[in-house]
Amino acid sequence: MWDSPIIFTRMRELVQSVSPAALSWAVVAVYIGTFFWLKSRSSKQRLPLPPGPRGLPLIGNSFQTPAVNPWEKYKEWSDEYGPVMTLSLGLTTTIILSSHQVANDLMEKKSTIYSSRPQLVMFNRLSGGMNSSGMEYGKRWRDHRSLQASVLRPWMTQRYTALRDVETKQLLAELLKTDDFSSCFKRMVASLFMTLAYGKRVQYPDDPEIRGMEELVRVKSEAGEASFRATGQLVEYIPLLQYLPSFLTPWKEMCDRICEQFNKTFVDRLREGINAPAWTWAKEVSKHKVARPMSELEVSYTLGTLYEASLTSQQILRIIVLVAALYPEKAAKAQEELDKVVGADRLPAAADVRNLPYIDAFVKEALRWRPFAPLGAPRESIRDVEYNGYLIPKGATILVNQWALDYNEDVFPEPFSFLPERWIANPDLPFSTFGFGQRGCPGRYFAQDSLFISTARLLWAFNIRTASPVEVEDMLRNPSAGAFLSPIPEFDATFAARDAQRKALIEKEWEIAPKESYAILREVEKELTSEA
C-alpha cells in the first residue's frame, strides 16, 4: 500500500502551483457563460418549477444551505414550500422530495426517468467511470447491475446462512472478550464480503485484508475531500471546468493515481476469487453472459463497488448498539420475545425471523430514528416531466430527503422517540432506508438478512449499555457529517453476557464452528444447487 502522506504532500504542491489569478479568471468566465446559457434555456420553459426559497443571482441558494446536516434545513423549507421543492445550488437545479407519496410517485412509478446520476466529475474520475454507483442510466449501468444481481437475488441471499452463522458466532465470541464493537463489526462485515466475493475469510480485526482495502477506500475519500477543497467543489457545480488545461486542474493527476490503485486491487482480488477452490461471487459474475464482452477490469469493479457499499453495514450495526444502549427498556422487550421464541439453549437462527416481529420492528425503528444516509444519493432527471402542475426539468438533480420522510409527524408521531411498537401497530408503515426504484441499494436483501440475524443474536446474548454518558442530541446530529452521509459519532458501550449459560453456549458454538473459507463456501454452494 502506498504512502498517503507523500501523496497529500504532492497534492498540496500541485494545488499551490496553480496561479490563483489564472484560475479565478477561468472560473469566472466559464461560470458566467454557463449561467447565461442556462438562463436562456430556462426562459423557454412554459411550466413553473416547484416553489422554493429565493436565491441570489449566479450563486442561487448555495450560501443559504448549511454545510452541516443540510437535510434539517431542507425539511424546514419543505414544511413551508411543500414536499416538492426547488433549490438552485450554483448552476444546478435541485429538486428536493420530502414525502413518501411524492418519492413513490416519481422514484418508484417513474423509476426509469429518475434512475440516472448527475455528472459526478470527481467521483467518476477516481474510479475511471467504472463504479456503477456513479454511472448514468443506460446499458452499461444495467449490465453492471445485472452482474451484481446475479449474486444478490433475494432467494440467493437467504442461502448464505452458513456464512452468516459462522461470522455472527465469531462476533459474539469476540464481544465476550472486548467492548471494541466497532472493530468487531468491521471484521465481520469485511469477512462476509471477502469470503463470498473472493473466497477469503477475515479472521482478525487487524487482518491485512481489512487494512489494505480499508486504507484504499480511506485514501480515496480523503484525496477526494482534499481536491474538493481545492477545485473539486467548483468542478461539481460547473462540470465544464474539467476540460481546463492540466496546469489549472492538478486534482486530475491525483484522481488518476488513486484510480490506478483501485484498478490493481480489484483485479488482483477478482483473480484470487476465480482461482479459489470453491464457489465464489468472482466465479459467478465472470461466467455470466453479460460479462463476456467486458474487460477483466470492468468485471472486477462490479464486485469492488459492492465492497465499498458494504462498509455502510458497519455504521448500521453501530446504530443498533446505540439504540440498545440508550433505550434498555426497548432492548428488554426484544429480549423477552427472544426468550419466548428461542430460549437460552440455542442461538437465534434465520428460521426464527417470522416469529420475531419485535426484532424486525426494533431494526426498522433504529434505521428510521437515526438514518445513516439522510439525503440518499443524487439522481438526475433524463427528460422534462410535469408533476402536479410543475416542471421537473431534464438534467435536474433529484434528492430524496430521507430525514424528512422519517421525521414526518403525520406518518411517524413523536418522531424523535424510539418506538419499535409503531411498526407492530401498523406493519404497513413506509420503510425506505434502502432507497427507491431501480437505483435502490443492490444489496438490500443481503443487508437486511445479515442485519436481522446480527441484531437478534446480539440482543439474545448481551445486555448493552453506554460506557459513559451519551447525549441523544449529539448522536442524532453529527457535526462532521458530509453532504449526504451522516455516520454516528464515536461512543463507547459495554457488552455483558446475560447469564453464564449463554456465555458458555457462545464459547462452545464458536469452538465447533467451521472456520475454513472453502468448507463454508461449499455449504453455501450446496444450498444454492439444491434451490436451483
UniProtKB/Swiss-Prot annotation:
Pathway assignment: Secondary metabolite biosynthesis; Alkaloid biosynthesis
Sorted alphabetically, which CDD domains does this protein's record hold? CYP64-like (cd11065)
Provide the E.C. number(s) assigned to this enzyme. Answer: 1.-.-.-
* The protein, known as: Cytochrome P450 monooxygenase criE
| Cofactor(s) the protein requires to work | heme
- Please list the GO terms describing molecular function: heme binding; iron ion binding; monooxygenase activity; oxidoreductase activity, acting on paired donors, with incorporation or reduction of molecular oxygen
From the record, give the cysteines joined by S-S bonds: none
The alphabetized UniProt keywords are:
Heme, Iron, Membrane, Metal-binding, Monooxygenase, Oxidoreductase, Transmembrane, Transmembrane helix
Localization per record? Membrane
Please state the gene responsible for encoding this protein.
criE
Q: Where does heme bind?
A: 441
Membrane topology for this entry? Single-pass membrane protein
What organism does the record attribute this protein to? Aspergillus cristatus (Chinese Fuzhuan brick tea-fermentation fungus)
* Sequence intervals crossing the membrane: 18-38
Give the matching InterPro entries: Cyt_P450 (IPR001128), Cyt_P450_CS (IPR017972), Cyt_P450_E_grp-I (IPR002401), Cyt_P450_sf (IPR036396), Cytochrome_P450_fung (IPR050364)
* Family as reported in the entry's similarity comment: Belongs to the cytochrome P450 family.
Which Pfam families does this UniProt record tie to the protein?
Answer: p450
Summarizing the function annotation, the protein's role is: Cytochrome P450 monooxygenase; part of the gene cluster that mediates the biosynthesis of echinulin family alkaloid. The pathway begins with the biosynthesis of the cyclic dipeptide cyclo-L-Trp-L-Ala (cyclo-TA) by the NRPS criC via condensation of L-alanine and L-tryptophan. The prenyltransferase criA then catalyzes the first prenylation step, a reverse prenylation reaction at C2, to yield preechinulin. Preechinulin is the substrate of the cytochrome P450 monooxygenase criE that catalyzes the formation of the double bond between C10 and C11 to produce neoechulin A.
Give the catalytic activity: preechinulin + reduced [NADPH--hemoprotein reductase] + O2 = neoechinulin A + oxidized [NADPH--hemoprotein reductase] + 2 H2O + H(+)
Gene Ontology terms, cellular component aspect?
A: membrane
Q: Reply yes or no: does the keyword Membrane apply.
A: yes
